[in-house]
């Protein structure tokens, strides 16, 4: 699952990206850096710190960034928005890596290759402070299965300099996706020593988060995100899962031209 390791930037602006895009029709460039404390892979009981750069170019409804990839997001007058994105899944390795999720404990499981993906998004800001979003993520390469996510965002505080938001997200995968990340087939069982396991399709994670964005001036801003994730029964009992709940903390600073 791509939300850990190299996809650190996903956690940086995800709660604000859709809302910001809807409010800004100009063109701008943002660069920055962030650091994240997170498990070495989804289900690991070992944590690691990682730093990563951030880049985003946005012109009206078009964008290119390290969070989602390249895409288009259109807002309707009633707060509804639709988007389509071409992005990637970083994959997972069976050794220690700075680029991907992974740990040497997974030796014999093989690598989950980096895959090109497309994401279809629909959301609705029902009020200035409450909105929900759903998306479908499909692989274009490396048939790794489908993902389906539903998210609810609530803005607790918003003024000229600060925004505080809480969110919850339920993540689903079909049988192929869940087995890619949490299943153990015959060959993997022989090579790794893990028992065989079939995860099946359905819910694979639930996230709860609170995040804060602060504007120091017209160009500099900061961000902090604390996220708690729980893994449901179908992936909790996988032999690759050592811990079925974990925290992720992300902090970053950004400069907008």
Language model region names:
Residues 1-28, 44:
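Cleavable N-terminal export/targeting peptides
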Residues 21-72, 81, 176:
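Short glycine/proline- and aromatic-enriched beta-strand/turn motifs that initiate or cap beta-hairpins
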Residues 23-29, 49-51, 60-62, 78-82, ...:
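Outer-envelope beta-barrel architecture signal
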Residues 31-36, 63, 98-102, 125-133, ...:
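Flexible, solvent-exposed coil segments and beta strand-coil junctions
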Residues 39-51, 95-114, 199-201, 234-239:
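Surface-exposed strand-loop-strand hairpins of Gram-negative outer-membrane beta-barrel proteins
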Residues 52-54, 152, 244-257:
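Outer-membrane beta-barrel "beta-signal"
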Residues 73, 138-141, 145-221, 229-235, ...:
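Outer-membrane beta-barrel transmembrane domain signature
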């Amino acid at each position: 699952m791509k939300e850990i390791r190299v996809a650190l930037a996903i956690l940086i602006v995800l709660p604000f990206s859709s809302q910001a895009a809807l409010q800004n029709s100009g063109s701008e460039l943002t660069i920055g850096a962030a650091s994240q404390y997170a498990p070495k892979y989804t289900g690991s009981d070992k944590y690691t710190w990682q730093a990563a750069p951030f880049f985003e170019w946005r012109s009206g409804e078009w964008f290119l960034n390290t969070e989602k990839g390249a895409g288009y997001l259109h807002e309707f007058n009633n707060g509804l928005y639709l988007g389509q994105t071409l992005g990637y899944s970083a994959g997972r390795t069976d050794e220690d890596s700075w680029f991907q999720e992974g740990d040497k404990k997974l030796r014999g499981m093989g690598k989950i290759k980096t895959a090109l993906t497309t994401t279809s998004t629909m959301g609705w800001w029902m009020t200035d402070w409450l909105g929900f979003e759903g998306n479908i993520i499909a692989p274009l390469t490396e048939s790794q299965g489908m993902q389906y996510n539903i998210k609810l965002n609530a803005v607790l505080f918003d003024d000229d300099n600060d925004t505080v938001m809480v969110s919850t997200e339920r993540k689903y995968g079909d049988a192929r996706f869940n087995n890619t990340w949490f299943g153990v087939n015959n060959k993997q069982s022989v090579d790794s020593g893990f028992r065989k396991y079939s995860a099946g399709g359905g819910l694979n994670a639930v996230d709860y988060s609170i995040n804060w964005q602060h504007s120091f001036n017209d160009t500099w801003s900061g961000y902090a995100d604390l996220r708690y994730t729980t893994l449901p029964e179908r992936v909790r009992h996988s032999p690759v899962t050592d811990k079925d709940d974990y925290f992720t903390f992300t902090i970053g600073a950004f400069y907008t031209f």
